[in-house]
């Protein structure tokens, strides 16, 4: 019988604040403000913010950038025992990468009602066909994360 996993939530808000700071960096470049950090053993091993426009790469979501950086940092494509903090609920592309990289837990801020696949448009991580289970939790600093996104799009609409 599997032992229940003990989850340390004591630094969730601290790591989400790091992700929010990265989201602000992306916003300053005109990117949709989403930031992500990947943590293993209490240390940040990967950071990223959305950069598909500036990087001419449609896959350059914050989660992708952070996971790629983390994999390089630890010289391993698998990241067991790690937690991904991201300011917006992951999409299907990012959720697939999260499973393939064996991330243990995802903590996100704001819901993504149109493309979020963790809870909003389906519960991807609970699907029986997956060979890896990912724990997930939403709403951590959700109001701040949502406000940053809302303000970004409000300002973008005002410019057009």
Where are these regions (language model features)?
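Zinc-dependent deaminase
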Residues: 1-26, 90-160
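Short, basic and Ser/Thr-rich N-terminal targeting/leader segments
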Residues: 30-34, 80
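Short beta-strand scaffold segments in enzyme catalytic cores
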Residues: 34-42
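A cytosolic small-molecule/anion-sensing beta-strand core signal
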Residues: 40-41, 68, 80
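Short beta->alpha transition motifs characteristic of CBS
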Residues: 45-52
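A short, polar/charged loop-to-alpha-helix boundary motif
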Residues: 54-65
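Immediate flanking context of iron-sulfur cluster ligation sites
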Residues: 76-88
């Amino acid at each position: 019988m599997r032992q229940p996993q003990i989850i340390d939530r004591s630094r969730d808000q601290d790591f989400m604040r790091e992700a929010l700071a990265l989201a602000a960096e992306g916003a300053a470049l005109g990117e949709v403000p989403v930031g992500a950090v990947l943590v293993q053993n209490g240390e940040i091993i990967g950071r990223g913010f959305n950069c598909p426009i500036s990087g001419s790469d449609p896959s350059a979501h914050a989660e992708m950038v952070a996971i790629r950086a983390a994999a390089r940092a630890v010289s391993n494509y698998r990241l067991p025992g790690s937690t991904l903090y991201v300011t917006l609920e992951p999409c299907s592309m990012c959720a697939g990468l999260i499973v393939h990289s064996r991330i243990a837990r995802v903590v996100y801020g704001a819901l993504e009602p149109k493309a979020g696949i963790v809870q909003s448009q389906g519960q991807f991580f609970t699907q029986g066909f997956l060979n890896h289970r990912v724990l997930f939790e939403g709403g951590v600093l959700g109001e701040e994360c949502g406000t940053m996104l809302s303000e970004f799009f409000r300002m973008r609409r005002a410019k057009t």
